[in-house]
Design a protein with these regions (language model features):
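NAD(P)H dinucleotide-binding glycine-rich loop of Rossmann-like/cofactor-binding domains
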Residues: 14-32, 36-39, 48, 61-133
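Short, well-ordered loop/turn sites that connect or cap secondary structure elements
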Residues: 49-57, 130, 229
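Conserved N-terminal Rossmann-fold NAD(P)-binding element of oxidoreductases
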Residues: 136-142
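Hydrophobic/small residue at the entry helix of a nucleotide-binding pocket
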Residues: 144-145, 220
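Adenosine-nucleotide cofactor-binding segment
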Residues: 154-220
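C-terminal capping/lid region of NAD(P)-dependent oxidoreductase domains
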Residues: 206, 276-293
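Glycine-rich phosphate-binding loop and adjacent beta-alpha segment
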Residues: 216-281
Length: 293
């Protein structure tokens, strides 16, 4: 969003980011309400926490709480890598005792780990929700969280299950097909519920999906998620663009008794589950390194 607002101008991106932090004391995007996460080195541990945490000064960690609520000071913006949504800065942040974090593992490059940890909640929730034999639809399957969810969904659904990936562009469709995590991959506009519903009906012989996981960060995809899911199925909205009103009234309007879950960026063990995916799948690790690290 900031890149779009700045017209791709890196100096303008830096100016917007510095302005946000200067005004709010944290990096909370006033348009989206979200903020990202950070990778940093522990400089000091509060006296009351010394000996009660597994951290020590000098440890490299990724914070798993949003920068929208992390006290932050930016002294200097050193490099902006808009293609991978990462910014290098000199600065300081405060992580509270309740703030969750992950130590950067020795066996994975920092930027690779950071790119996956940024969306760790989605694949970990997928691991919790998907059962053997489930038919699962991933909307936004070609993106960062989408690819991780596809891998995890296939792992959990097993040979008796079915994973369907819905991508936006032809490029992301081809990329996901090559990865081989999905039984079916197709390209469609997720804001158009009826054509997508018809395609899912065709792929599932009219049975529809047990679980739909929505990773698309655009508005108006609520009805697509609901209509593609069985009446007693489950929709997981990981997308920050989800409208409670559209989802609730939409399901009511079409007489769907679907269970809807608001995506929580945290679930127990989410960092470990997500990093383990990169260790297990060479194809996933390779594509994440190429695209995001």
């Amino acid at each position: 969003q900031i890149e779009e607002q700045a017209g791709g101008d890196k100096a303008k991106i830096a100016e917007i980011m510095l302005g946000i932090v200067e005004k709010q004391g944290k990096h909370r995007n006033p348009v989206t309400g979200s903020g990202g996460m950070l990778l940093g080195t522990v400089e000091k541990i509060g006296d009351a926490l010394v000996g009660k945490t597994d951290l020590k000064v000098g440890d490299k960690i990724a914070t798993l709480v949003s920068l929208s609520l992390t006290p932050l000071r930016i002294d200097k913006i050193k490099e902006i890598r808009a293609d991978v949504d990462q910014v290098d800065i000199d600065g300081k942040a405060i992580l509270f005792e309740s703030g969750i974090y992950a130590k950067i593992p020795a066996d994975l490059p920092e930027k690779l780990a950071l790119s996956a940890l940024d969306v760790a909640g989605a694949p970990a929730q997928t691991a919790k929700l998907v059962k053997p034999g489930d038919t699962v639809l991933i909307i936004g399957a070609g993106g960062k969280s989408g690819m991780l969810c596809c891998y995890e969904a296939k792992k959990r659904a097993g040979v008796t299950g079915k994973v369907i990936g819905l991508c936006h562009s032809q490029r992301s469709t081809e990329r996901l097909q090559k990865l081989g995590f999905c039984d079916y991959v197709f390209s469609a506009d997720a804001t158009q519920p009826v054509p997508v519903m018809e395609k899912i009906a065709e792929l599932t012989n009219g049975e529809m999906c047990d679980i739909t996981i929505n990773n698309v960060n655009i508005t108006d995809t609520e009805m697509t998620s609901i209509l593609c899911t069985k009446n007693d199925g489950l929709v997981y909205f990981f997308s920050m663009a989800t409208s409670f009103t559209k989802a609730a009234l939409g399901a009511e309007g079409v007489g769907s008794d679907v269970t809807m879950i608001v995506g929580n960026g945290y679930t127990k063990g989410h960092a470990e589950i997500t990093l383990q995916e990169l260790r297990e799948s060479e194809a996933l690790r390779k594509i994440f390194t190429e695209l995001y690290a």
